[in-house]
């Protein structure tokens, strides 16, 4: 089963992402922020990582950089789930090593569709 | 498992409140001239989360409004604009607006649009120099560019896709992209160009050397193709060209595949980005109205159970509980083992097992109660804002000192103590603290101090509200009380101690303010404060010194589920008196008993006459007989003292309160029941109720009054 790690500091968004993915039959783990996600990603190998950009302690961009530095996650799809739509932010995400982005407002169908693009 | 939107929505509301609190707390702590970038980040994040969540849950008014705040904060974060005390004010009011909108969504209550538009305008003004960034996202931009070539007879698309070598490092995969193209057009023609593959010796497995030519059906929208390449557009050379008219060009396309460089040089398209983006925004905007109405309905239906409140519990507390339950199960199985095959020589084991059970039960009880415990900061956190607003309105300088905010208190008690605390703090600033020049004149620091402190004392929590203001002048208070008829005209000032006079401020209908201001004195007096506190089983005391300040001390039980009780015996029945109400217990010396008019027995104890209430008669348990040498338990409620005549004092113990009202019916003089160790039911005395009933009887029967 495809293992997905979803990081977001908002409980409601986290729950929603996790419900949606579980409903669709994925194996999901969630993290409260970047550093939590990094810890979890180091413990288990995930097939896809979905992360918010703005989070306390460790933000999404830092998380991507850290994950890309780990040989296990060199090629793993990492999607940014964000409200930031500016080209500049997306560019920053890209530069950090993100695979793609999902623009909030979060929509379950879009999430699943986007996810299909990477697995 | 279906997505429970209502549940999630509720969670979002809760979360949003937390974010608002963060926003407010951080903003209040800011000194505009010296702002820590991390603070701005925290504030930005709070606003950002509110916006994101609100958009997700289709609360578009909130997300749009918050967007303006976020846009401004973003500029501050990027050091393009700097915070001023004015902008902090605007942001604080913005937080208020969001709060109002939240409540509006929860209760279907209309929101004052005026406040919202004022704040929005002010935010716009703050952003003046940089307004354009706020409009790009929320307003759907209709893009006409996509329509341009729709009229032309297009027979196909020619897509030339040359990934950069490092494409894999972003987690993207060209094969997935090709796969997606095949999904929108199953008959697409795909040609792979492997001419760039190096000889095996120089081959690096992690790099991408291939490129592709894909010919797609002309009926497909260009945007659909661009969307597929959206993520990799800057990691590849991409060229999408429409093919018109005849078949020839399509064939030449396949021919050019051999020399891809030529095509690349001609056209490296960077266009798709903005177009694809606006397209996706439009889609979202189209969807929202119908979705909003669809989701509003269940929300409204769920309104009825909005009173069902939830509590967020620290995971450590839950872990602890689980551990304890585990222990309990072990102890239980140990005891079962002993019981299965019991003989007298196992009595020692049984005893130690029972001890363990006792220990487990105790800890479990404590931990379960602990779940409902929240730190005082939940109540205290609103005060910085309150003080800030009040001090500027009253032109007073106030320094708020908060301590003990980590002290934990039962959620219900905490929620119900907030209003009384707000009242006390308001009073302290409005009536207590003097204006800065008055303070300077009397040699004080022009800045007054209000302190809030909470700490545990025994089984209770004590909350203090102190000010270093003018203090309460007892003589003036007395005159005022006479004027308002709060004390009967035959009372004399000398008969009362200063403390008793001070207690008059808790009398109904008494206000110390000369004028009713919009801040205090709106009819909710200190009597309500005291009543609220006493309903929680607590009490309040006041101390004050002229020129030095006043101090209110509130004692509250930690929880409403359990109380520390004194077991007493009256005519063979065991009753429980809440320990917190007991002042002292004395053996009656008949020489101190006097008979007042109306047949009331008064006990003279250190300058004070305390009426005696014979519980035997009160509860119809027979005659109580002579007072000589009997026990008198002195209890106090609402500043009134009374002596309860008892037969015997038993032990003190914590009792679990069971409601009599919900299981039987309300009984006057009894606040509840509990079950004792031997299984018998014992009634818990309602001291306040007993005193009130006693006073009422007395007022009916004679003109004399209880000396308060």
Language-model features: where?
Chain A
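Charged docking surfaces used in two-component/phosphorelay signaling
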Residues: 15-23
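Short hydrophobic/Thr-rich beta-strand motif most characteristic of the beta2 strand and flanking loop
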Residues: 25-32, 40
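Active-site beta3 strand of CheY-like receiver
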Residues: 45-50
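Active-site residues of response regulator receiver
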Residues: 52, 82
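Receiver (REC) domain active-site loop signature in two-component systems and cognate sites
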Residues: 55
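Short, glycine/charged-rich "phosphate-handling" switch motifs in NTP-dependent
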Residues: 99
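C-terminal output helix
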Residues: 106-115
């Amino acid at each position: 089963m495809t293992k997905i790690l979803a990081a977001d500091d908002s409980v409601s968004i986290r729950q929603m992402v996790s419900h949606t993915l579980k409903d669709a039959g994925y194996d999901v783990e969630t993290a409260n922020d970047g550093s939590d996600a990094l810890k979890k990603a180091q413990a288990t190998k995930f097939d896809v990582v979905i992360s918010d950009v703005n989070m306390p302690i460790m933000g999404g961009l830092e998380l991507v950089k850290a994950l890309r530095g780990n040989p296990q996650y060199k090629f793993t799809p990492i999607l940014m789930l964000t409200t930031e739509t500016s080209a500049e932010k997306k560019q920053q995400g890209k530069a950090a090593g993100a695979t793609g982005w999902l623009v909030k407002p979060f929509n379950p169908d879009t999430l699943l569709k986007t996810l299909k693009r990477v697995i | 498992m279906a997505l429970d939107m209502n549940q999630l929505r509720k969670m979002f509301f809760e979360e949003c409140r937390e974010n608002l609190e963060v926003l407010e707390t951080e903003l209040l702590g800011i000194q505009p001239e010296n702002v820590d970038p991390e603070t701005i980040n925290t504030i930005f994040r709070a606003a950002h989360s509110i916006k994101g969540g609100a958009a997700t849950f289709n609360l578009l008014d909130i997300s749009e409004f918050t967007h303006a705040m976020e846009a401004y904060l973003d500029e501050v974060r990027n050091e393009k604009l700097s915070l001023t005390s004015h902008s902090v004010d605007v942001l604080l009011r913005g937080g208020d607006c969001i709060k109002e909108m939240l409540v509006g969504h929860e209760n279907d209550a209309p929101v004052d649009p005026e406040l919202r538009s004022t704040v929005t305008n002010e935010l716009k003004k703050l952003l003046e120099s940089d307004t354009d960034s706020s409009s790009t996202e929320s307003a759907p931009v209709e893009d006409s560019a996509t329509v341009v070539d729709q009229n032309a007879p297009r027979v196909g698309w020619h897509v030339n896709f040359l990934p950069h070598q490092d494409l894999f490092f972003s987690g993207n995969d060209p094969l997935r992209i090709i796969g997606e193209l095949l999904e929108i057009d199953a008959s697409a023609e795909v040609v792979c160009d492997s001419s760039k593959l190096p000889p095996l010796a120089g081959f690096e497995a992690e790099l991408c050397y291939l490129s592709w030519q894909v010919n797609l059906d002309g009926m497909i929208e260009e945007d659909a193709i661009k969307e597929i390449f959206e993520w990799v557009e800057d990691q590849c050379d991409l060229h999408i060209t429409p093919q018109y008219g005849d078949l020839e060009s399509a064939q030449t396309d396949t021919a050019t595949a051999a020399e891809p460089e030529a095509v690349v040089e001609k056209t490296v398209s960077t266009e798709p980005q903005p177009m694809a983006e606006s397209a996706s925004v439009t889609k979202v905007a189209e969807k929202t109205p119908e979705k909003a109405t669809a989701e509003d309905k269940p929300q409204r239906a769920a309104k009825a159970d909005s009173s069902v409140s939830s509590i967020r519990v620290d995971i450590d507390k839950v872990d602890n509980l689980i551990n304890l339950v585990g222990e309990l199960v072990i102890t239980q199985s140990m005891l079962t083992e002993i019981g299965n095959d019991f003989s007298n020589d196992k009595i020692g084991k049984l005893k130690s097992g029972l001890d363990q059970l006792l220990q487990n039960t105790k800890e479990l009880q404590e931990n379960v109660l602990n779940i409902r415990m929240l730190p005082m900061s939940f109540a205290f956190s609103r005060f910085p804002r309150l003080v800030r607003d009040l001090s500027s309105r009253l032109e007073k300088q106030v320094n708020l000192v908060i301590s003990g905010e980590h002290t934990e208190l039962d959620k219900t008690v905490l929620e119900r103590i907030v209003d009384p605390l707000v009242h006390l703090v308001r009073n302290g600033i409005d009536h207590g603290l003097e204006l800065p020049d008055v303070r300077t004149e009397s040699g004080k620091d022009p800045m007054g101090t209000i302190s809030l402190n909470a700490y545990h004392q025994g089984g209770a929590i004590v909350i203090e509200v102190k000010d270093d203001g003018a203090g309460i002048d007892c003589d003036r208070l007395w005159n005022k009380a006479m004027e308002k008829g709060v004390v009967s005209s035959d009372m004399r000032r000398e008969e009362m101690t200063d403390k008793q006079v001070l207690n008059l401020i808790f009398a109904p209908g008494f206000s110390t303010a000369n004028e009713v201001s919009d801040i205090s004195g709106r009819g909710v007096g200190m009597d309500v404060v005291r009543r609220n506190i006493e309903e929680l089983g607590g009490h309040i005391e006041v101390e004050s010194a002229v020129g030095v300040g006043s101090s209110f001390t509130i004692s509250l039980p930690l929880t409403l589920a359990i109380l520390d009780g004194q077991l007493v015996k009256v005519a063979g029945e065991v009753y429980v008196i809440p320990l917190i109400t007991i002042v002292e217990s004395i053996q009656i010396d008949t020489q101190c008993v006097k008979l007042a008019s109306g047949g009331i027995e008064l006990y003279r104890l250190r300058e004070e006459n305390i009426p005696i209430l014979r519980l035997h008669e009160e509860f119809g348990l027979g005659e109580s007989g002579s007072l000589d040498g009997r026990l008198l338990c002195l209890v106090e409620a609402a500043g009134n003292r009374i002596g309860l005549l008892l037969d015997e004092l038993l032990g003190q113990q914590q009792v679990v309160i069971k409601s009599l009202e919900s299981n039987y019916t309300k009984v006057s003089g009894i606040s509840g029941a509990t079950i004792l160790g031997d299984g018998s039911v014992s009634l818990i005395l309602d001291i306040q109720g007993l005193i009130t009933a006693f006073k009422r009887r007395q007022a009916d029967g004679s003109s004399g009054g209880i000396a308060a």
